[in-house]
Amino acid sequence: GEQTGNVVHVGPIHSPVAGRTDHLPMHVPAGSYVIPAEEVAFLGEGNTLNGFKNITEWVEKYYDHTFTNAGSPVPIVAAGGEYVIPPQSVYGIGDGNLEKGHRILDEYVKKLRQKHIKTLQKLPPPKRD
Protein backbone atom coordinates (compact mmCIF):
# COMPACT_ATOMS: atom_id res chain seq x y z
CA GLY A 1 0.00 0.00 0.00
CA GLU A 2 0.84 3.64 0.07
CA GLN A 3 3.71 4.63 2.33
CA THR A 4 6.15 7.49 2.73
CA GLY A 5 9.78 7.97 3.65
CA ASN A 6 12.27 5.30 2.73
CA VAL A 7 9.61 2.61 2.65
CA VAL A 8 8.79 0.91 -0.63
CA HIS A 9 5.50 1.42 -2.54
CA VAL A 10 3.45 -1.17 -4.43
CA GLY A 11 -0.12 -1.01 -5.70
CA PRO A 12 -2.23 1.94 -6.81
CA ILE A 13 -0.75 5.43 -6.69
CA HIS A 14 -3.45 7.78 -5.38
CA SER A 15 -2.74 11.46 -5.94
CA PRO A 16 -4.47 14.76 -6.63
CA VAL A 17 -1.75 15.31 -9.28
CA ALA A 18 -2.92 14.52 -12.81
CA GLY A 19 -1.81 11.33 -14.51
CA ARG A 20 1.07 11.55 -16.99
CA THR A 21 2.74 14.17 -14.78
CA ASP A 22 5.51 12.37 -12.98
CA HIS A 23 5.82 14.41 -9.78
CA LEU A 24 5.73 11.80 -7.03
CA PRO A 25 9.16 10.57 -5.92
CA MET A 26 9.08 7.14 -4.28
CA HIS A 27 10.93 3.86 -4.06
CA VAL A 28 9.56 0.64 -5.57
CA PRO A 29 10.85 -2.90 -5.12
CA ALA A 30 13.47 -3.95 -7.69
CA GLY A 31 11.71 -5.89 -10.43
CA SER A 32 8.38 -4.03 -10.10
CA TYR A 33 6.40 -3.01 -13.16
CA VAL A 34 4.54 0.31 -13.45
CA ILE A 35 1.28 0.36 -15.43
CA PRO A 36 0.76 3.87 -16.88
CA ALA A 37 -2.22 5.91 -15.63
CA GLU A 38 -3.98 6.01 -19.00
CA GLU A 39 -4.01 2.21 -19.26
CA VAL A 40 -5.18 1.89 -15.64
CA ALA A 41 -8.15 4.16 -16.41
CA PHE A 42 -8.89 2.28 -19.65
CA LEU A 43 -9.02 -1.01 -17.72
CA GLY A 44 -11.61 0.65 -15.49
CA GLU A 45 -13.63 1.84 -18.51
CA GLY A 46 -12.51 5.40 -17.86
CA ASN A 47 -12.58 5.06 -14.07
CA THR A 48 -9.14 4.94 -12.43
CA LEU A 49 -10.43 3.51 -9.14
CA ASN A 50 -12.18 0.70 -11.03
CA GLY A 51 -8.94 0.14 -12.99
CA PHE A 52 -7.04 -0.14 -9.69
CA LYS A 53 -9.58 -2.73 -8.51
CA ASN A 54 -9.32 -4.78 -11.72
CA ILE A 55 -5.51 -4.80 -11.66
CA THR A 56 -5.40 -5.65 -7.94
CA GLU A 57 -7.47 -8.77 -8.65
CA TRP A 58 -4.96 -10.24 -11.11
CA VAL A 59 -1.93 -8.95 -9.17
CA GLU A 60 -3.18 -11.01 -6.22
CA LYS A 61 -3.96 -13.99 -8.49
CA TYR A 62 -0.41 -14.12 -9.90
CA TYR A 63 1.43 -13.20 -6.67
CA ASP A 64 4.20 -15.79 -6.19
CA HIS A 65 5.40 -16.15 -2.60
CA THR A 66 8.45 -18.15 -3.72
CA PHE A 67 10.01 -15.06 -5.37
CA THR A 68 13.11 -13.80 -3.60
CA ASN A 69 14.31 -10.20 -3.58
CA ALA A 70 15.56 -8.82 -6.93
CA GLY A 71 17.77 -6.23 -5.21
CA SER A 72 17.58 -2.87 -3.48
CA PRO A 73 14.50 -0.66 -3.87
CA VAL A 74 14.60 1.56 -6.96
CA PRO A 75 13.90 5.31 -6.77
CA ILE A 76 11.34 6.47 -9.36
CA VAL A 77 9.24 9.54 -10.00
CA ALA A 78 5.68 8.35 -10.51
CA ALA A 79 2.34 9.85 -11.52
CA GLY A 80 -1.03 9.63 -9.84
CA GLY A 81 -3.18 6.92 -11.37
CA GLU A 82 -0.26 4.60 -12.10
CA TYR A 83 -0.11 1.12 -10.59
CA VAL A 84 3.07 -0.49 -9.26
CA ILE A 85 2.91 -4.24 -9.77
CA PRO A 86 5.12 -5.96 -7.17
CA PRO A 87 7.95 -8.17 -8.46
CA GLN A 88 6.28 -11.23 -6.90
CA SER A 89 3.37 -10.78 -9.33
CA VAL A 90 5.64 -9.95 -12.29
CA TYR A 91 7.50 -13.19 -11.49
CA GLY A 92 4.21 -15.12 -11.34
CA ILE A 93 2.99 -13.63 -14.63
CA GLY A 94 6.29 -14.79 -16.18
CA ASP A 95 5.85 -18.36 -14.87
CA GLY A 96 8.79 -17.97 -12.50
CA ASN A 97 10.83 -15.71 -14.80
CA LEU A 98 10.99 -12.00 -13.92
CA GLU A 99 12.27 -10.92 -17.38
CA LYS A 100 9.53 -12.92 -19.10
CA GLY A 101 6.97 -11.26 -16.81
CA HIS A 102 8.26 -7.82 -17.85
CA ARG A 103 8.06 -8.77 -21.55
CA ILE A 104 4.48 -10.05 -21.12
CA LEU A 105 3.47 -6.85 -19.31
CA ASP A 106 5.16 -4.68 -21.99
CA GLU A 107 3.09 -6.47 -24.65
CA TYR A 108 -0.05 -6.20 -22.51
CA VAL A 109 0.35 -2.43 -22.08
CA LYS A 110 1.05 -2.03 -25.81
CA LYS A 111 -2.11 -3.99 -26.70
CA LEU A 112 -4.18 -2.02 -24.18
CA ARG A 113 -2.94 1.23 -25.72
CA GLN A 114 -3.82 0.04 -29.25
CA LYS A 115 -7.27 -1.12 -28.09
CA HIS A 116 -7.85 2.22 -26.34
CA ILE A 117 -6.95 4.14 -29.52
CA LYS A 118 -9.36 2.00 -31.58
CA THR A 119 -12.10 2.56 -28.99
CA LEU A 120 -11.57 6.33 -29.08
CA GLN A 121 -11.61 6.36 -32.90
CA LYS A 122 -15.04 4.67 -32.90
CA LEU A 123 -16.63 7.18 -30.53
CA PRO A 124 -18.93 9.82 -31.99
CA PRO A 125 -17.77 13.43 -31.66
CA PRO A 126 -19.04 15.46 -28.69
CA LYS A 127 -22.59 16.78 -29.07
CA ARG A 128 -22.92 20.44 -29.90
CA ASP A 129 -25.69 22.72 -28.70
Give the ranges of each region predicted by the language model.
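Gly/Thr/Ser/Pro-rich low-complexity intrinsically disordered regions
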Residues: 1-129
